Amino acid sequence: MEKIQIFGARVHNLKNIDVEIPRNSLTVITGLSGSGKSSLAFDTIFAEGQRRYIETFSAYARNFLGGMERPDVDKITGLSPVISIEQKTTNKNPRSTVGTTTEIYDYMRLLFARAGKAYSYATGEPMVKYTEEKVIEMIQSDYAGKKILILAPLVKSRKGHYRELFESMRRKGYLHVRIDGEVQELTPGMKVDRYKNHDIEVVIDRLAVKSPLALSSPSSPDDRLKKSVQIAMKQGEGLIMIMDHETGAVKHFSRRLMCPTTGISYGDPAPNTFSFNSPQGACPRCKGLGYINEIDLDKVIPNRKHSIHDGGIVPLGKYKNQMIFWQISSILAGYECDIKTPINEIPEEALNEILYGTLEPVRIDKELVHTSSDYFVDYDGVIKYLRSVMDDDDSTPTSRRGPSLGSEKWAEQFLAECQCPECQGQRLNREALSYKIWDKNIAELANMDLDELREWLNEVEKHLDKQQQQIAAEILKELRTRLDFLLDVGLNYLSLNRQSASLSGGESQRIRLATQIGSQLVNVLYILDEPSIGLHQRDNERLIHSLKELRDLGNTVIVVEHDRDMMLSADYIVDIGPRAGRKGGEVVFQGTPTELLKTDTLTARYLNGSVRCDSVAAKKTTTDQHLVLTGCRGNNLKGITAEFPLGKLIVVTGVSGSGKSTLINETLYPILSKHFYRSLQAPLPYDSIEGLKYIDKVVNVDQSPIGRTPRSNPATYTGVFSDIRSLFVNLPEAQIRGYKPGRFSFNVKGGRCETCGGNGYKTIEMNFLPNIQVPCEECHGKRYNRETLEVRFKGKSIADVLDMTINQACEFFENVPDILRKIKTIQDVGLGYIKLGQPSTTLSGGESQRIKLAAELSKKDTGNTFYILDEPTTGLHFEDIRILMEVLRRLVDRGNTVLVIEHNLDVIRQADHIIDMGPEGGRGGGTILSTGTPEEVANSDKGYTPRYLKEELERQ
């Protein structure tokens, strides 16, 4: 069958549509936000493919997999096995990294286990190992004619009294042991200091080594020497020590890898030796995380202008008549201060005593505690008190403890992640880090940018010996292949050690895409959700090449996408529209890109240039007010100074990984958030910031959900639901019945339907079949009880209002200004098609972001707000971008500053000011290449953005 055919698709807003998609093609499904693209691609095609796959399992297995409802579609034919690659960052496990997700790190572990060279972590010398025969040969050579002691190591630098060990050795017939370098006779009941570290060896034999000439055959060893070495090897579990009787000098030998100087030995390396998720390889201090949690003094004392009396030390709170405040008062009295002195005026020495405790007991003045005489109390310090809460240290005597500071969870607010001091953030123990290939250990390779790692893999074979080359050849080939797939999808700036939780949705999706290309599957249907998210135009070309490569393997690739280049490179396009929500859900075009350009659909008009995403003209005025951030050096930033002109639309551009998010989301925003709201999020390192006096608040409008449960919706988020409930409560019928605003909430008892708890549906457990949700038989999905629904405004109940689209609600409330003002802003950001009570869990990231923008637009404006948006065009059609730009321009026209991180050229060319970063991603980025108007940046000769921007400006 040459086509995938969908007949009668009616999922969500799809209007009984029929669609044909050619097999073994790259097909783009496009259309306005909310038009039904995802409903067709994911909720129809993917859902049906998944359902058919799961139906092949037994009922017992299906119970564990969860249910897959049949999508509302008449028939789908020609469907292959389906794999969905969505843009969700689902893995929040700190142990998951780019390396573990792609399995590249697994191959790296195998490479080091098979071809790594071991070095001593103590001396840096190459580790050695010996056979019994080699040990005997070296003894005969080095100690010929000398008296020696043959020792078997039993304990290496460990505490304990070892009474049982000594008794066991005595029962085996041994007469002497060597304890901490001193040979002693084994005696009954012998033991050592249990609180000190000890080195213990048992003396296996004392003998004079015969010269090879004195033996009957120079090539055959002395029988006694041979037997003693064998016993020592067995007793010492592969380790043996030879001590010169005359000088006391000791040499170490081992069947295992061993440092010839110190005797430190390693077990044979295995892949788990290099795994930070295994006890064998993980750093013992941080357990393989690379960081530990330490108390952050900036969180304990966030504002040093406050006094201790007024709560300057946050864990203590404001002054209370308690022992700890008496102790602190006593300490401060010795420095001629008191607890009402601002903390920044307290001498450093006094503050250290308050935080970390005193060496001597603190004298408590009798007048403070109303006793007949002064008395002395031990004082451990605020930090010790906090640690006792976190460690739940029940061994700490009650009299020595601080005040009741709450639970461990409460204490966690004063913690900050910091690099593990033992492994320096490398996650592995010192043994694993001591294996090297071409002077690099596995952690150093995992921290390289992927393109740097690829260069290393290209060159490493020249630096291996013949045996290593033979062992490593296949592993290196697999590593290069998998790495190339990641580079092809524009992820060259990442490292294998990058945590999965820190990746954007687009990065996670492209990693999964690279993994799928690497799997070399054929006859599969892949469905991707906007893979171009977060990609610069330069990287986008490589992504398109990768998708075509996936197609050329013999697969069908369906991409939900708005990117111009992606659409024009596709084999086939399905355009869903004509508008969004109830006005969408139809196929307005299906065919080739060439055929699309000849039509008059909204998408075609934008593609052929007859319509553009222009908002009103950019501001040409100059401003004296700037926010200046200097010395930014977090992640890959190279001590840069960034200048942000206020009252303008600023766009930060640059290739993926160039440092945009580091500069804005991890440096600038935390600084502003800490300044205005005392946020505890610490910014990355910087020197100074100037110009804060010109702004009065910061708002980060991101794409995170507006709520985590179906009970949250646009009405509750924007606050308009409170106004609607107030309207209903003031209606005559509600007044007669004595209803309060809570009566019209589906979250509290009173007005909601108690049968379903205000959900509108009930979940039915099906035992060995998937659970199903059915409309509540009492309220029929309306969420409220009958009495509440009897109160009506213009013939509509509260449930009817929540079921209206934003467009319908604007007409309905046209004479209620307070409600209309808030709803109108949602309509203004292009979301007229969503329902007022639509569950937040069903909204896309782009829709959530625009609802947040609408909420900001509805607020009273000071004109000095600093807005930050990270890739707001995600999930947006050209028409949606036009509407978004009008909204952003409105904010700027009020005097606010809007800063956008963006790759979309339709946004970049409309900026008042551009900051272009690069030139490359990762270590090759971190600098500001050019700044200015779009025309000024387009004329720059630095980086990649100017070339693409110039082409875009010439197209106008």
What are these regions (language model features)?
Residues 1-956:
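Conserved phosphate-binding elements of NTP-dependent enzyme cores
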